[in-house]
C-alpha cells in the first residue's frame, strides 16, 4: 500500500509526463500552437486532482476529457457560424460572442455541477477563436480545426499516461463505501429508535447522505473507467435509491417513536439497541431481525420498520453483487426491476443562473468595448481571461475564492513566466531534452501543489503555460510576453471586481423554491404508481442544496426532511384513486411550484391544503382507516403551518 506522499509523487509524475508528451507530439505533428495541447493535458489531469485534494480516479480524468472535447467542438461551431454571418460587422460579432458566453454560463448553472464544464468551456472557446481570427478571418476554419486537434491531442495524452502508469481505479473505494453501508444504516436506525441524542442523529444522517451521493458520483467514474463494470454500475444505481429509502425509513421510525413511544415491541427495541461494530456483526443483526419479524408477524408493527428490514435485505444482496461483479441472478434481477429509474426535477436555481449569465455577459461586453475603443494591445487577452474566470468561477461553491485563485495564479505567473521566457526557454532552443526537462520541472512542482489545494496553484499552472511562447516556430519578443501577462492579470482582476459588484441575492428566493419543490414532490406521491416516478434521489439532492445554502437553519432542514418522509409514506400507502380530486390537487401543486407573485402562490397553497383536506374527508366517508389517512392529514397540516416558508 502506497503512502500519501508516494501517491502525490506518482500523480505529479503522470501530470508532468502527460504535458511533456503532448508538447512533443504537438511539435512532431507541426501544430502551430503546441501549448494548447500541453495546457489541455495539464488541466484535464490537474483540475480533478484539485477538486479531490489528491490523485483523481481514472474515470474522472476521462470524463473531464470528454466534457472538454464537447465544449471545444460546440464553441468552434458557434465561432464559425458567427464569423460566416457577421464578418462585415465585427463589433456586432464580438458582442454576440459575449452574449453566447453569457448564455453558456447561464445554462451551465442550470445543469449538474459535473456537466457544467462543457457549457462554460464552449462559451469562451467561441470568444477565443473569433478574437484570434479578427485580423485574418479567412483562416477561421483552419484555426478552429487546429484548436480542436490540439485539444484532442492533449486529452489523449492525459488519458494514455494515466492508463499506462498505475491508473487509480475507483472500484476499491466503491467496495469500501458499499461494504460499510449496512453498518451505517443500522447505526442510524439505532440513533432514531433511541431518539435521545438529536445531534448524533443529525451527524449519522448527514454522513450517510454524503456517502450515498459520493457513491453516485463514483458510479459515473466507474462507468467510464472500463467496460467490465456495467453490472456493478446497474447495482450501484439501485443501491443509491435504496440507501436513501432506508435513511427515510429510519427518520420515519424516529417520528413514529416521538409520537407513539411504545410503537415498537420490546424484543425489537432490545435487538436494535444492542451495539454493532463491524459489517459482519451488522449482517448477523439483520438476519436476527428477519427471524424475529417472521416469528412476531407483521401485525402491530410500524410499516416503516417492516420496510426498513426488507430494504436492508435487498441492500445486502446488492452489496454482495457489487463486490463480486458476478452475473445478475433471477432474484437480484427482480430486485433491480422493482427499482424505478430516478426522475429528475427542474432546477431551482433559475434566478441564480440568470445572475451568473449576466455577470459573464456584462464583464465580457465591457471588456470588448474598452478594447475596441482604446486599441490596447493586451485587450484581447484581458477580455478572454474575463470570460474564462467568470464562466468557471460562478459554478464553484465559492466564486470569490475561485476568482482570487486565478488572480493569485496570474500574479505568480509573471515572475515565473519571465524567468522561463527570458532565460530558460531561449537557452534550450538547441536541445529538445532540456526544453522538456525545464517545462517538466514547472509542471511537477505545480502538480504537487495542486493536490494540496494551495491557493493559486491551479491559476499558476494555467497562466504560466498560457503566457509562454510554446509555438511552432518559437519566438521570444518581449512585447508579446508583457502584453499577455498584463492582460491576464487585469482580466482576472476585473472578473473579481464584477463578481464583487454584481451581487447574487438569490439565496432567499432559491430557498423558497427548494421548499416548494419538496412540497411538490410530497404531493406527487399521490399520483398513480406508473406516473409518479422515483423522486427520492432528486429530493435528497435538493435537501443537500438547502443545507449548503442554509447550514444553520435547523427548522428549515427539519421541515424538508418531514416532507421527504411524508412523500415516502404517501408513495407506499394504499389510498384509493379519485381521478378528479387528484387532478385538482396536482394542478394546485403545479401552480405553487411555478411561482409567479405572492398572491398567486398564496392562493395556490390555500387551494392545495383545501383540496388535500377535502380528499381526506372524502376517503374517511368511504370507510378508509384513520391510520392510512394519517400521512394525508399530516401533509395538509404541515403545508398550512409552515406556509410562511413556502411564500414570499
From Swiss-Prot:
Its main location: membrane. It comes from the Bacteria. It is a multi-pass membrane protein. GO terms for cellular component: plasma membrane. The chain crosses the membrane at residues 11-31, 41-61, 65-87, 91-110, 125-145, 150-170, 369-389, 406-426, 430-450, 458-478, 481-501. One of its GO terms (molecular function) is transmembrane transporter activity. GO terms for biological process: carboxylic acid transport. Pfam families: FUSC. Forms an efflux pump with AaeA. Could function as a metabolic relief valve, allowing to eliminate certain compounds when they accumulate to high levels in the cell. Belongs to the aromatic acid exporter ArAE (TC 2.A.85) family. This is p-hydroxybenzoic acid efflux pump subunit AaeB. It comes from Edwardsiella ictaluri (strain 93-146).
Amino acid at each position: 500500500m502506497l503512502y500519501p506522499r508516494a501517491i502525490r509523487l506518482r500523480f505529479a509524475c503522470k501530470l508532468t509526463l502527460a504535458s511533456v508528451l503532448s508538447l512533443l507530439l504537438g511539435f512532431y505533428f507541426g501544430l502551430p500552437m503546441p501549448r494548447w495541447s500541453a495546457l489541455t493535458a495539464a488541466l484535464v489531469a490537474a483540475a480533478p486532482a484539485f477538486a479531490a485534494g489528491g490523485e483523481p480516479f481514472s474515470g474522472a480524468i476521462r470524463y473531464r476529457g470528454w466534457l472538454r472535447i464537447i465544449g471545444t467542438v460546440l464553441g468552434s461551431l458557434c465561432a464559425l457560424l458567427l464569423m460566416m454571418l457577421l464578418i462585415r460587422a465585427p463589433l456586432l460579432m464580438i458582442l454576440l460572442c459575449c452574449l453566447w458566453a453569457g448564455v453558456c454560463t447561464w445554462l451551465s448553472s442550470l445543469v449538474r455541477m459535473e456537466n457544467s464544464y462543457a457549457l462554460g468551456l464552449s462559451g469562451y472557446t467561441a470568444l477565443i477563436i473569433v478574437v484570434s481570427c479578427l485580423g485574418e478571418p479567412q483562416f477561421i476554419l483552419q484555426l478552429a480545426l487546429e484548436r480542436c486537434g490540439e485539444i484532442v491531442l492533449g486529452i489523449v495524452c492525459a488519458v494514455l499516461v494515466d492508463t499506462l502508469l498505475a491508473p487509480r481505479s475507483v472500484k476499491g473505494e466503491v467496495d469500501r463505501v458499499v461494504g460499510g453501508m449496512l453498518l451505517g444504516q443500522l447505526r442510524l436506525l439505532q440513533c432514531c429508535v433511541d431518539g435521545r441524542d438529536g445531534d448524533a442523529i443529525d451527524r449519522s444522517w448527514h454522513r450517510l447522505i454524503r456517502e450515498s451521493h459520493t457513491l453516485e458520483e463514483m458510479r459515473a467514474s466507474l462507468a467510464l473507467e472500463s467496460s467490465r463494470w456495467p453490472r456493478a454500475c446497474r447495482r450501484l444505481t439501485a443501491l443509491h435509491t435504496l440507501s436513501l429509502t432506508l435513511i427515510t425509513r429510519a427518520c420515519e421510525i424516529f417520528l413514529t417513536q416521538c409520537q407513539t413511544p411504545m410503537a415498537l415491541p420490546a424484543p425489537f427495541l432490545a435487538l436494535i439497541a444492542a451495539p454493532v461494530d463491524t459489517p459482519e456483526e451488522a449482517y448477523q443483526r439483520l438476519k436476527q431481525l428477519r427471524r424475529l419479524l417472521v416469528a412476531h408477524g407483521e401485525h402491530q408493527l410500524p410499516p416503516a420498520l417492516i420496510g426498513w428490514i426488507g430494504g436492508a435485505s435487498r441492500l445486502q444482496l446488492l452489496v454482495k453483487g457489487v463486490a463480486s461483479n458476478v452475473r445478475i441472478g433471477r432474484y437480484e434481477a427482480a430486485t433491480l426491476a422493482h427499482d424505478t429509474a430516478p426522475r429528475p426535477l427542474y432546477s431551482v436555481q433559475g434566478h441564480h443562473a440568470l445572475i451568473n449569465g449576466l455577470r459573464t455577459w456584462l464583464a465580457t461586453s465591457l471588456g470588448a468595448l474598452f478594447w475596441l475603443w482604446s486599441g490596447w494591445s493586451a485587450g484581447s487577452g484581458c477580455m478572454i481571461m474575463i470570460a474564462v474566470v467568470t464562466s468557471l468561477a460562478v459554478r464553484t461553491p465559492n466564486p470569490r475564492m475561485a476568482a482570487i485563485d486565478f488572480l493569485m495564479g496570474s500574479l505568480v505567473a509573471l515572475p515565473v513566466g519571465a524567468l522561463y521566457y527570458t532565460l530558460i526557454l531561449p537557452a534550450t532552443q538547441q536541445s529538445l531534452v532540456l526544453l522538456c526537462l525545464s517545462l517538466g520541472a514547472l509542471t511537477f512542482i505545480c502538480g504537487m501543489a495542486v493536490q494540496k489545494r494551495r491557493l493559486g496553484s491551479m491559476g499558476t499552472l494555467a497562466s504560466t503555460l498560457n503566457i509562454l511562447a510554446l509555438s511552432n516556430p518559437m519566438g521570444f519578443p518581449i512585447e508579446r510576453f508583457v502584453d499577455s501577462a498584463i492582460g491576464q492579470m487585469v482580466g482576472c482582476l476585473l472578473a473579481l471586481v464584477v463578481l464583487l459588484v454584481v451581487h447574487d441575492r438569490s439565496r432567499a428566493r432559491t430557498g423558497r423554491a427548494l421548499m416548494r419543490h419538496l412540497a411538490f414532490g410530497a404531493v406527487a406521491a399521490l399520483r398513480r404508481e406508473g406516473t409518479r416516478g422515483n423522486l427520492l434521489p432528486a429530493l435528497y439532492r435538493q435537501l443537500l442544496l438547502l443545507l449548503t445554502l442554509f447550514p444553520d437553519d435547523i427548522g428549515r432542514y427539519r421541515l424538508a426532511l418531514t416532507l421527504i418522509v411524508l412523500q415516502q409514506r404517501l408513495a407506499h400507502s394504499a389510498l384509493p384513486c379519485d381521478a378528479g380530486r387528484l387532478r385538482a390537487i396536482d394542478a394546485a401543486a403545479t401552480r405553487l411550484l411555478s411561482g409567479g407573485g405572492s398572491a398567486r402562490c398564496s392562493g395556490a397553497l390555500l387551494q392545495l391544503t383545501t383540496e388535500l383536506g377535502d380528499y381526506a374527508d372524502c376517503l374517511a366517508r368511504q370507510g378508509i382507516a384513520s391510520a392510512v389517512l394519517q400521512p394525508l392529514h399530516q401533509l395538509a397540516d404541515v403545508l398550512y403551518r409552515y406556509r410562511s416558508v413556502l411564500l414570499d
